[in-house]
UniProtKB/Swiss-Prot annotation:
This is Biosynthetic peptidoglycan transglycosylase. The gene is mtgA. Its main location: membrane. It catalyses: [GlcNAc-(1->4)-Mur2Ac(oyl-L-Ala-gamma-D-Glu-L-Lys-D-Ala-D-Ala)](n)-di-trans,octa-cis-undecaprenyl diphosphate + beta-D-GlcNAc-(1->4)-Mur2Ac(oyl-L-Ala-gamma-D-Glu-L-Lys-D-Ala-D-Ala)-di-trans,octa-cis-undecaprenyl diphosphate = [GlcNAc-(1->4)-Mur2Ac(oyl-L-Ala-gamma-D-Glu-L-Lys-D-Ala-D-Ala)](n+1)-di-trans,octa-cis-undecaprenyl diphosphate + di-trans,octa-cis-undecaprenyl diphosphate + H(+). It holds the Pfam family Transgly. Peptidoglycan polymerase that catalyzes glycan chain elongation from lipid-linked precursors. NCBIfam families: mono_pep_trsgly. It is a single-pass membrane protein. It comes from Escherichia coli O1:K1 / APEC. InterPro entries: Glyco_trans_51, Lysozyme-like_dom_sf, PBP_transglycosylase, Pep_trsgly. Its EC number is 2.4.99.28.
Length: 242
């Protein structure tokens, strides 16, 4: 290998190492800060806003209103757990059984990829990372998930998740969603409304709360049944999530 190539390789290696250190400090600081402070915006919100500007859409505003857990209907927390991660109170960030099932499904159905991200993983991804699929991003997501599971309580993870989740075009967080779609604060959401909001979470830019498709309605009904089977509101109290 020539001296010039060695120099370039050495420069790139030093740059990447320094970048990793900077990102580790940034993300570690974010995990520590947001364990107590409200989250003003997420990486997904920034990505959506910048993308809108780059496409000439200057009317787009990524909107979110932070609310604490006692300002959110307990039905909402229960709905997203029923829909997205029923083992949320028990695991340490990863649902191994669901991951194995998703891998088996994806091997059989290459055109219909199924995910197995927990609420903790989705929180880490939405808060700190860019959109897309790659092994690098998955590795970073795993590390960040372990970080927030170590530092944050389950209640804090759920609170942050509900405040940064995307519920529609420019609608981030359950308070903004409740105001936009039901003209009420998040604290007043009914069981049915909470289930409808949770029903669009797989793809909130495709599935609409304001114009729910047959699929969304059937998913809403399924979520309502799961909420009942989990035990209703006492489930949240039992796991200290309310």
């Amino acid at each position: 290998m020539s001296k010039s190539r060695l120099t370039v390789f050495s420069f790139v290696r030093r740059f990447l190492l320094r970048l990793m250190v900077v990102l580790a400090i940034f993300w570690g600081g974010g995990i520590a800060l947001f364990s107590v402070a409200p989250v003003p915006f997420s990486a997904v919100m920034v990505e959506r806003q910048v993308s809108a500007w780059l496409h000439g859409n200057f009317r787009y505003v990524a909107h979110s209103d932070w609310v604490s857990m006692d300002q959110i209907s307990p039905w909402m927390g229960l709905a997203v757990i029923a829909a997205e991660d029923q083992k949320f109170p028990e695991h340490w960030g990863f649902d191994v059984a669901s991951i194995e099932q998703a891998l088996a499904h994806n091997e059989r159905n290459e055109n219909r990829i199924r995910g197995a991200s927990t609420i903790s993983q989705q929180t880490a991804k939405n808060l700190f990372l860019w959109d897309g699929r790659s092994w690098v991003r998955k590795g970073l997501e795993a590390g960040l998930t372990l970080g927030i599971e170590t530092v944050w309580s389950k209640k804090r993870i759920l609170t942050v998740y509900l405040n940064i989740a995307e519920f529609g075009d420019g609608v981030f967080g359950v308070e903004a969603a409740a105001q936009r779609y039901f003209h009420k604060p998040a604290s007043k959401l009914t069981r049915s409304e909470a289930a409808l909001l949770a029903a669009v979470l797989p793809n909130p830019l495709r599935f609409k709360v304001s114009a729910p498709s047959g699929y969304v309605r059937s998913r809403q009904a399924w979520i309502l049944r799961q909420m009942y089977q989990l035990g209703g509101e006492p489930f949240m109290q039992q796991h200290q999530l309310d």
